[in-house]
Amino acid sequence: MKFATGERGIQQDFSFHHRPDRVNNTDSYGYGKFANAYGEWSWYVAGTQYKFSTEKINLLVDYYLDGIYKQMVYGVYEDVGVRNRDVTNKRNGVERKGTLEIERLLISTDYRKKELEEIIKLRKGQATPSLSFAKFFWQTEHFVFQRPNFYTSVRMFSTRNQNMEQPYNGPGKTTHHRADGTNY
């Protein structure tokens, strides 16, 4: 677990790149595959001689709180602006994310415990959003602005990053211009 700025992995701004095209993959590969796999392993080895070092588990928590959850609507719902070619897949509405990965983290560490517990409460519908922030994920050209009563984001691109993913096997052919400043 380390920063991999300019390469595949966690970027210094807590976004995630899965490929060298530098397209934002924080929600898909960075959350669903990378962070959750590390979180699961941290849970398996918590309290043993194999537990993650404080530095590494803290980086994982920071990645969840300052990267993944800040690119989600209130840390609860997927932000459509972060999705790539999979945005063309049909879905049945918007669902709250679960709490399993957070509960596992809290067994591994108490670092930033209050913030993690707030996300659990939000996801269970036991609290209302209180966090206000504006964050530009400069490695992936994604800007998020949140207040307790609203959330908005803008997806952009630059000369450093690809606009969108390549349209592999058809998905994504209609999404090329989404990063021309799409606002959600």
Walk through the language-model features, giving the residues of each.
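Extended polysaccharide-engagement surfaces of secreted carbohydrate-active enzymes
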Residues: 41-184
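Active-site lining segments of carbohydrate-active enzymes
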Residues: 1-51
